[in-house]
Amino acid sequence: MADEKPKEGVKTENNDHINLKVAGQDGSVVQFKIKRHTPLSKLMKAYCERQGLTMRQIRFRFDGQPINETDTPAQLEMEDEDTIDVFQQQTGGHRI
């Protein structure tokens, strides 16, 4: 029984953080560890820096829904190992 209590303590500690995958359109996957109540803007900016992109060039989606910079993993009910999809911002239109 004494062995069970430390395991529960470890679980509670890890519960504050969540591992998220960010999948690019090119098939690349970058993993991040973030606190459940930290705004996702931190992850989004880190991803952009790592990929040499700006926030204006790409869009982040989770379960098909756009992610706002102020959203947190807890608000979006994200679970450990969930994947965020990244899409290049569509630019252009038609030629006149």
Curated annotation (Swiss-Prot):
Residues spanning the membrane: none
Main localization category: nucleus
InterPro entries listed in its UniProt record: Rad60/SUMO-like_dom, Ubiquitin-like_dom, Ubiquitin-like_domsf
GO CC terms in record: nucleus
Cross-link named Glycyl lysine isopeptide (Gly-Lys) (interchain with K-? in acceptor proteins), sites: 93
Prosequence residues removed at maturation: 94-96
Pfam families in UniProt: Rad60-SLD (PF11976)
Record key words, sorted: Isopeptide bond, Nucleus, Ubl conjugation, Ubl conjugation pathway
Localization per record: Nucleus
Record note on quaternary structure: Interacts with sae2 and ube2i. Covalently attached to a number of proteins.
Protein name as it appears in the record: Small ubiquitin-related modifier 2
Gene transcribed to yield this protein: sumo2
